[in-house]
Each structure stands twice: as structure tokens, then as C-alpha cells.
């Protein structure tokens, strides 16, 4: 077992770490954007089972669950294209759990998607419905 782990090429681990750093930088940019617009960040990288929502924020009577997709290349498509039916279902599941956990039933709920590619930044409010 130990030999299997050590046989993984170093560059794969390095690339995985680089992807995490790129993703975190994108999430930081979106969190800053939300804060500048008056949103309070409630959670970052909130997990429920093996599913995750990148940012949960609130403003007035709205709570938004934000999926952030950061790309350094469009080789595999734009970030928005990665928020498919399966990903939306996962986000909805986490949102339901979070609302129940925190007793936020009186809030209006919104699902936003942010896509970052190099210097371009696209933020879509109400990107999909529950």
C-alpha cells in the first residue's frame, strides 16, 4: 500500500495543489466582491457529507449559495459549463441541510454561480432554481 502511494508521480500532487490554490484565489475574489456589495460571508467551503458549497452569504433577507469555478484554461470548457445538473443537485442538498441546521427558513434563497477565467469575472445571480 505504501509503495502504491509513493509511485504516484510528483507532478500530479504538485498539479493538484496548484489547482487548489487557483480555486482558493477565485473564491477569495468572489468573497471580496460579495463583501464590497454588502454581503456577509457566513461560510466558506461548507461541507455536508462529500458535497460542498464554496460560499454561503447573506444580505437583508436573502441567503445565497455560491458556486465558484476558476479556470486558467478553457481547454475543458468555461467554469459555468461545469455547474451541470449533478452539481446543482449537490448544491441544493447542501443548501437544504444548511437551512435546516441554522434555522434559516425565513430567508429567501438564491443560487449564484461565479466564473473566473484569467482576468475576466462573471457573476450570475439566481443562476438556477431549487
Predicted features, each with a name:
Residues 1-44:
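Acidic-basic catalytic patches of nuclease active cores, encompassing PD-(D/E)XK
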Residues 53-76, 91:
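Conserved catalytic cores of phosphodiester-cleaving nucleases, focusing on short active-site segments
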Residues 9, 70-119:
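Catalytic cores of nucleic-acid endonucleases
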Residues 63-65, 108, 121:
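Structural motif
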Residues 46, 116, 128:
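Hydrophobic pocket-lining residues within nucleotide cofactor-binding pockets
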